[in-house]
Amino acid sequence: MSPPLCPLLLLAVGLRLAGTLNPSDPNTCSFWESFTTTTKESHSRPFSLLPSEPCERPWEGPHTCPQPTVVYRTVYRQVVKTDHRQRLQCCHGFYESRGFCVPLCAQECVHGRCVAPNQCQCVPGWRGDDCSSECAPGMWGPQCDKPCSCGNNSSCDPKSGVCSCPSGLQPPNCLQPCTPGYYGPACQFRCQCHGAPCDPQTGACFCPAERTGPSCDVSCSQGTSGFFCPSTHSCQNGGVFQTPQGSCSCPPGWMGTICSLPCPEGFHGPNCSQECRCHNGGLCDRFTGQCRCAPGYTGDRCREECPVGRFGQDCAETCDCAPDARCFPANGACLCEHGFTGDRCTDRLCPDGFYGLSCQAPCTCDREHSLSCHPMNGECSCLPGWAGLHCNESCPQDTHGPGCQEHCLCLHGGVCQATSGLCQCAPGYTGPHCASLCPPDTYGVNCSARCSCENAIACSPIDGECVCKEGWQRGNCSVPCPPGTWGFSCNASCQCAHEAVCSPQTGACTCTPGWHGAHCQLPCPKGQFGEGCASRCDCDHSDGCDPVHGRCQCQAGWMGARCHLSCPEGLWGVNCSNTCTCKNGGTCLPENGNCVCAPGFRGPSCQRSCQPGRYGKRCVPCKCANHSFCHPSNGTCYCLAGWTGPDCSQPCPPGHWGENCAQTCQCHHGGTCHPQDGSCICPLGWTGHHCLEGCPLGTFGANCSQPCQCGPGEKCHPETGACVCPPGHSGAPCRIGIQEPFTVMPTTPVAYNSLGAVIGIAVLGSLVVALVALFIGYRHWQKGKEHHHLAVAYSSGRLDGSEYVMPDVPPSYSHYYSNPSYHTLSQCSPNPPPPNKVPGPLFASLQNPERPGGAQGHDNHTTLPADWKHRREPPPGPLDRGSSRLDRSYSYSYSNGPGPFYNKGLISEEELGASVASLSSENPYATIRDLPSLPGGPRESSYMEMKGPPSGSPPRQPPQFWDSQRRRQPQPQRDSGTYEQPSPLIHDRDSVGSQPPLPPGLPPGHYDSPKNSHIPGHYDLPPVRHPPSPPLRRQDR
């Protein structure tokens, strides 16, 4: 083989071997080299596409012709690029041997082996740096004939004779001990005894009596016999005394019997037992072993050369050299290519415009679009945007940079700068096109961040995530594997459910609170919680507790840590989160929010009061009698006037009246008072507010309301009305054998006695309301009835005035009732009596035909007008006390004639001996004035009112009068011939206001109008007078 080929062969073998180095070898380093490549690139080039149709009339303007179209087509070109790549080589002090880098000793180890760069390990019997000397201890020199000049049995180097002084002795001859305050090899360390002396060899402190401790920093307590010092060990710098061995275990960075000696260069860790692995001049920290690389190198072992474009400590500096120049990685000095010089390699060796070895060839570049030409070959350097051999061609579209040879080829998310085309790489990538990952131990943007991993193989170039060794987690690999992983590199997945963690060594699951089982797949049983489900729930009213924290899950209506508190008033539901909507003092159930209303209210939200007549929590019916009302909350009865007792069922006791029966009656001569308004009901023959006045002349009877029938100037008995005739006269009036025709007419007491009329008018004017009540009370007291009655009286006697006749009515015309209007009456009979006179136009249409009496006497029937409705339905049953219906009819009879026209079945026809009047229709109010007496008895004049509901309205309960509880007793037959039919009456204006309220739901009826209010529908019935007749029988109902 020729000699020129040998160097090439060795270089090829070296490159081949360099390519086979193992990158995981701790002694393998890397460097960057540049290389050029010729590639075929594609780019778009614009072309003008001419139109296919010719321009037919170009003279009309170019805008009328079809225009060419610009299209882009892909073309290819050859480009030469310079790039850099990372290559492996053995670190400084090492060389490659069979694929591995082994240490290199500059001097061959004669009788030993090279264990580190320039460090030999000699076999026994040999000494020296290269293990070539066999001098005995204490001798040195080539012939081993020179004694060492080292004292205290110190050894010396067998070649140089330099003494190796042990700890505590000063060089060069090891004869003098260390200066006080210093210790160790070559006396290079200061004592750490707080001013106290130390052992020159070990550095152990000699503490005074009052202090103790490894560094004399613990004070002793003084006693009677001196100082008492606590027992301490002698290990310094955090060393731990090992009792079994009786020695100190030193922390990282320290060594020696008491841990007083720092680690020598090249060692680190506990007891300095670990060897440093830093290359290329890097130093390791004696505590952590982390390498501090020399400028120009990086990596955890300082094995990598700084990337191209970076230099300095930890490759943190950026090179500031021309694009084609490289910088020295240690200090950043630029390494210029041929033809350039200067700190940045930007200065041309040739003057501008020339190039070549002698700088005599002129440049051919377009000066306007170029920078210059290369000083060696004359190649033009075009300004960005221009290309061509002479920089006179503009760059095609989508190209940039000098010579238009660059495309934005930024990979892995890199962004291309619009002006220069430089790529701003994404984190973890570097290079012109962001094609390369960050160098080892660097990551992030521009690979500027240093990895901080411990116990790791490498770190991610993107985010610095460490690839850890077995049992260590990601991050800086200083703690166990993260949750969910275990094993080598934490690549085994934990089989633990519900966020449980597993042991980084064994993978055993440690369950989170609330779960148990081999894989933490089972929830805690009900009633248990916490880690291992070992805790039991402490809840009162709950559906269990949270399996993790044990928080009680309260049932609706409960709250508190233990669900032991009921919801506060006004709240309800789960966690008492709902607000009650109960009104009027109602409360809600904490479980479901249902309202519990306060007494007197009802409804879902207690929004409605109890209906009238009801009270209490459930609006139960009131227990109050006689139409009294009760308090809606507690049901207390409020009695109407005239009633008393807890339930208002007891009438006022005799002699009392009014609300709560608190008033005392003021009635005399045996008169009784009305229990509601206190008005006196006088006995026969007495009148006045307090029954203190006797009947005036010409009157008699109850309240002196009946006129005497004894003739002018004659007296009558004030109680019975019997005439007190003068001698020679008898009868009533005091005339004998005089037949007077009967006249049906309205009469007043004035018609028979002027003095009585004047007194009657005065009494009516002053006591209208009282008279009504007195009359009703008197009737009740006289007859023992439960209801007041309407009376139709007969009156004999003739008054001057117009006559009226009641036309005959066939016998079949029976059972009539009236409509609400004024009507006129006529009297008719088969044998009409003498005509009767009625005064004035009041009854002008009524006639009085005479009718002879029959065998049994006169049978006079007053026939109602034709507009009174005919009623043929069967008579109803007995009068219902619960009904207030009033039937308006009119009939009278005092013989065994055809019977009355109107009969409701309450009185048999043969028993009917008196006229009957009742009211029924829509008419809400009716009055009957001046009821005349029947023949043969004293006359009575009275005033009464009747009320009843309108037809078609629901029946209403009649008022319960004060004497309704009395037993009915048969009354002596009055000779007045008056028959009374029960009907609900209103006594006076005051009693109207004292009536109990209507039942709920009934509107006020027409009959609730004030009495004697002459509105449409009011009418008066004229009194009727008839000839004397046999005494009538009365039927009590």
Swiss-Prot record:
What is the similarity comment for this entry?
Answer: Belongs to the MEGF family.
Q: Which residues form the signal peptide?
A: 1-20
Q: Where is this region: Disordered?
A: 824-891, 926-1037
Which proteins does it associate with, and in what oligomeric form? Answer: Interacts with SHC2 upon its aggregation-induced tyrosine phosphorylation. Interacts (via extracellular domain) with SVEP1.
Organism expressing this protein natively:
Homo sapiens (Human)
Reported modifications of this chain: Phosphorylated in the intracellular domain on tyrosine residues. Phosphorylated on tyrosine residues by SRC. Tyrosine phosphorylation is detected upon platelet aggregation stimulated by collagen, TRAP and thrombin and platelet-platelet contacts but not after platelet activation. Tyrosine phosphorylation enhanced its association with SHC1 and SHC2. Phosphorylated when in the presence of SVEP1.
Q: Which InterPro entries match?
A: EGF-like_dom, EGF_PEAR1L-like, EMI_domain, LE_dom, MEGF_diff_regulators
Q: Which residues lie on this side of the membrane: Extracellular?
A: 21-755
List residues modified as Phosphotyrosine: 925
Q: Where are the transmembrane segments?
A: 756-776
Cystine connections:
29-91, 55-65, 90-101, 105-114, 109-120, 122-131, 235-248, 250-259, 272-284, 278-291, 293-302, 315-327, 321-334, 336-345, 404-416, 410-423, 425-434, 490-502, 496-509, 511-520, 580-588, 582-595, 597-606, 619-630, 624-637, 639-648, 661-673, 667-680, 682-691
Domain called EMI: residue spans? 25-103
Q: What is this protein called?
A: Platelet endothelial aggregation receptor 1
Tissue expression as described in the entry: Expressed in umbilical vein endothelial cells and platelets (at protein level). Expressed in coronary artery smooth muscle cells (at protein level). Expressed in heart, kidney, skeletal muscle, pancreas, ovary, breast, lung, brain cortex, hypothalamus, spinal cord, dorsal root ganglion. Expressed in umbilical artery endothelial cells, megakaryocytes, osteoblasts, coronary muscle and erythroid cells.
Q: Which residue range or ranges hold the EGF-like domain?
A: 102-132, 225-260, 268-303, 311-346, 400-435, 486-521, 577-607, 615-649, 657-692
Keyword Transferase belongs to the record: no
What are the annotated glycosylation sites?
A: 152, 271, 476, 575, 634
Regions of this protein lying in the Cytoplasmic compartment = 777-1037
Entry's localization field: Cell membrane; Cell projection, Lamellipodium
Q: Does 4Fe-4S count among this protein's keywords?
A: no
Q: Name one GO biological process term.
A: recognition of apoptotic cell
Domain of life assignment: Eukaryota
User: Which keywords describe this protein according to UniProt?
Assistant: Cell membrane, Cell projection, Disulfide bond, EGF-like domain, Glycoprotein, Membrane, Phosphoprotein, Repeat, Signal, Transmembrane, Transmembrane helix
Where Phosphoserine occurs, the residues are: 953, 1029
